Regions:
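Alpha-helical segment proximal to the catalytic Tyr-Lys
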Residues: 128, 169-173, 232
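Catalytic loop of short-chain dehydrogenase/reductase
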Residues: 137-173, 185-186
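A glycine/serine/threonine-rich, flexible loop-to-helix segment
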Residues: 1, 49, 173, 185-208, ...
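Conserved glycine-rich cofactor-binding loop
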Residues: 16-17
Length: 250
């Protein structure tokens, strides 16, 4: 299937590892011109080499810290300058923040800033460019709403879900769609750091109908489709990629 992505441009945040890295490679394989950002510039350089080796075009690399207050405006400006325009925005930068109820305000504020505020600010900074050429795709990598404990990032991601739904009412008339992909247990540096192989096997057997953790590429294919012109009628929705982990039916 031709996804009609060749010649499109995309900005992918959190592209240095895991899901963001797989999304960047998936878009590049479809002929998308990339701007990639993350804190670790060395990992972005490695990503660029992998994309070129696979036959893709070297991405524009913009190492930045999404927690920095001025990053959204600077990143939007520099990404548009590098690629000419931004057709696709993938907000993947973020971090899980499990905490106790007594956690200090600064921990909450950091989690909310990274997982909600910066996503909103960057999106709003990119939107005028999308509106100017009457086309855009925004995909937010979020998280589950089915809570199993207190996690500051869950609250932030729930905010993303509500915000994007409202935003579709404002900007979809300009050919822009906004969707979210909440991951399940997807293999990453963080997963390997937090859960042993035994823990992963036990959790998979008990909680994931598919019986295993997912791979970043299995989520990336969904994002690549949502980024395409073919997904123009998919708008304002959440599409979990979790192997059946979520227990709710709708």
């Amino acid at each position: 299937m031709d996804l009609q992505l060749k010649g499109k441009t995309a900005l992918v945040t959190g592209a240095s590892q895991g899901i963001g890295r797989a999304i960047a490679k998936g878009l590049a394989a479809e002929g998308v011109e990339l701007v990639v950002t993350a804190r670790r510039g060395d990992e972005l350089e490695k990503l660029s080499a992998e994309i070129v080796k696979a036959g893709g075009k070297a991405p524009h690399i913009l190492p930045m810290d999404m927690l920095a207050e001025d990053t959204p405006k600077i990143l939007a400006r520099d990404a548009i300058k590098a690629a000419g325009q931004i057709d696709i925005l993938v907000n993947c930068a973020g971090a899980s923040t499990p905490i106790g109820w007594e956690a200090a305000d600064d921990i909450w504020e950091k989690a909310m800033t990274l997982n909600f505020t910066r996503v909103r600010q960057l999106t709003h900074a990119i939107l005028p460019d999308m509106i100017s050429h009457q086309w855009g795709r925004i995909i937010n990598i979020t998280g589950k709403s089915e809570t199993v404990g207190l996690n500051a990032s869950f609250s932030a991601k729930a905010g993303i879900h509500a915000w994007q739904k409202g935003l579709t009412r404002e900007v979809s008339k300009h050919g822009i769609t906004i969707n979210a992909v909440p991951p399940g247990r997807i293999m990453s540096e963080q997963i390997l750091r937090l859960y042993s192989e035994k823990d992963r096997a036990e959790f998979s057997a008990a909680e994931i109908p598919t019986g295993r953790y997912g791979e970043p590429e299995e989520l990336a294919v969904v994002v690549v489709f949502l980024a395409s012109p073919l997904a123009g009628y998919v708008n304002g929705v959440l599409i979990p990629v979790d192997g059946g982990l979520r227990r709710y039916s709708f």
